[in-house]
């Protein structure tokens, strides 16, 4: 359990690092490039993500799981690693070839698409799945921390006006590529040489495609929404409003879903050893963790966004506020589906049920986007995303009904929902009355956190009581 906690903290640090960089740069970039520049970047980047998606064909999740299966068997681990690396080079190369002959050479944003080819190359050399599979998250954090800091400095040095969009894209894509490439420095000590003739790349194709299908579906409500806003409205600013709203929600989401990345290899390894009860014990704790964090984060974001958005993004981003309020529920929905899907169904090999859930979400999201975006623009996309995530979570609850009694779990954790609602009512009333400033936003966060924890203490929640007892014990020592 100690290793899981350490890996969670390392992975949490890594995920926060990935998202904290745009959080640091966003106030500056949103003012420098403007809503149109941000919208152009988001729109072109959403298209590039399709080529990365098809190039990787599910290899990230599959690679993480397969390495987890053989993490303690060095020879098998060597073979699996090199087989998957070769397969990845082949598939991403095909995707890159198609990319150059379609968008990069002939697209409307040719120069931006050309620079963003580095993103596709970055996906080719990405081996983070290997370190996640062997449950070693420390190396990922340290190496990428340095690269990300360099990226932030480059943005502040070179991006000075709305005409510097290409320079911004270079800073983004180059640091992504160098960050992934740098992880190879550890490989000589962790992976041995193998004979090429002894490798069988072909055997991995079918299982990766099985995992690839749900990823295609997932991309519809993680990437296609931005593409559809741009295509259906033709207003680049609307893409920016949606992108910025999602960005804030995703930063909060990182705290919760990081546990899924850590738990997946552990559950896969335990399942292989037939320790089913241990698996379920871990997941019940995951549910409690999600209820404890996700609900106050969701209601907290909805309560403070009217005070936060004006000073953080600057003028011209008022529509980000309703975007955040509407899309905030995905914090809870994705956190729950992360447990049932990423932490349970995938590691134990129940891909069909996982695929069913995300395909359902894909269809729902696409149809809702077609109906809502033309009428409500970015807000319509936000509504569609929430409905889609609700359908994914609903299907997964149904598929795991014999393994977990979700309603019993929800009832056992209802105190977190009640405490979050109490906090929301007070902060939602207070926030608009205060002048928009960094001090007042943090004041709302501190007051909200105090109300949430105080309410849990009043109703004598076990988690809070245990935490207080541990603190008392340590102080006593």
Named regions from a protein language model:
Residues 120-144, 329-360:
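Membrane-interface junctions at transmembrane-helix termini in multi-pass inner-membrane proteins
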Residues 117, 142-189, 207, 214, ...:
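Hydrophobic alpha-helical transmembrane segments
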Residues 27, 55-72, 249-287, 291-294, ...:
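Helix-loop junctions and terminal segments of transmembrane helices
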Residues 3-60, 96, 152, 172, ...:
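Signature of the first transmembrane helix
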Residues 234, 428-477:
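Membrane-proximal transmembrane or re-entrant/amphipathic helices at the cytosolic face
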Residues 102-119, 236, 301-333:
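Interfacial segments at transmembrane-helix termini and the short loops linking adjacent helices
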Residues 1-23, 75, 198-214, 320, ...:
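N-terminal membrane topogenesis motif
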């Amino acid at each position: 359990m100690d290793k899981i906690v350490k890996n969670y903290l390392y992975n949490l640090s890594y995920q926060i690092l990935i998202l904290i960089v745009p959080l640091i740069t966003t106030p500056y970039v949103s003012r420098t490039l403007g809503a149109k520049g941000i919208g152009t970047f988001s729109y072109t980047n959403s298209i590039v993500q399709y080529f990365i998606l098809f190039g990787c064909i599910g290899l990230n999740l599959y690679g993480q799981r397969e390495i987890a299966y053989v993490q303690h068997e060095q020879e098998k681990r060597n073979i699996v690693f090199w087989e998957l690396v070769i397969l990845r080079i082949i598939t991403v190369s095909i995707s890159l070839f198609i990319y150059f002959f379609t968008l990069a050479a002939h697209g409307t944003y040719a120069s931006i698409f050309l620079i963003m080819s580095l993103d596709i190359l970055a996906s080719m050399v990405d081996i983070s799945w290997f370190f996640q599979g062997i449950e070693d998250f420390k190396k990922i954090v340290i190496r990428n921390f340095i690269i990300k800091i360099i990226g932030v400095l480059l943005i502040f040095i070179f991006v000075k006006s709305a005409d510097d969009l290409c320079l911004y894209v270079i800073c983004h894509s180059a640091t992504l590529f160098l960050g992934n490439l740098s992880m190879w420095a550890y490989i000589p000590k962790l992976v041995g040489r193998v004979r090429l003739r002894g490798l069988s790349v072909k055997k991995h194709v079918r299982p990766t495609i099985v995992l690839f299908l749900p990823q295609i579906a997932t991309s519809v409500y993680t990437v296609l929404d931005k593409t559809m806003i741009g295509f259906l409205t033709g207003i680049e600013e609307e893409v920016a409003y949606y992108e910025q709203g999602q960005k804030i929600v995703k930063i909060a989401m990182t705290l919760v879903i990081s546990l899924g990345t850590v738990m997946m290899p552990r559950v896969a390894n335990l399942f292989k050893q037939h320790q089913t009860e241990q698996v379920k014990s871990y997941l019940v704790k995951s549910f409690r963790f999600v209820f404890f964090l996700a609900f106050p984060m969701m209601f907290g974001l909805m309560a403070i966004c009217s005070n936060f958005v004006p000073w953080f993004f600057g003028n011209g981003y008022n529509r980000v506020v309703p975007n955040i309020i509407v899309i905030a529920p995905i914090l809870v929905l994705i956190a729950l589906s992360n447990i049932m899907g990423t932490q349970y169904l995938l590691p134990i090999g129940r891909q069909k049920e996982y695929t069913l859930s995300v395909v359902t979400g894909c269809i729902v999201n696409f149809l809702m986007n077609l109906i809502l975006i033309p009428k409500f623009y970015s807000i319509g996309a936000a509504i569609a995303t929430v409905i889609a995530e609700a359908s994914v979570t609903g299907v997964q609850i149904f598929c795991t009904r014999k393994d977990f009694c979700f309603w019993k779990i929800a009832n056992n954790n209802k105190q977190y929902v009640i405490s979050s609602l109490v906090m929301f009512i007070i902060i939602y009333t207070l926030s608009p009355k205060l002048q928009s400033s960094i001090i007042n936003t943090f004041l709302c966060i501190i007051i909200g956190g105090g109300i949430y924890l105080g309410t849990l203490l009043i109703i004598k929640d076990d988690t809070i009581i245990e935490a207080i007892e541990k603190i008392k014990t340590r102080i006593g020592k």
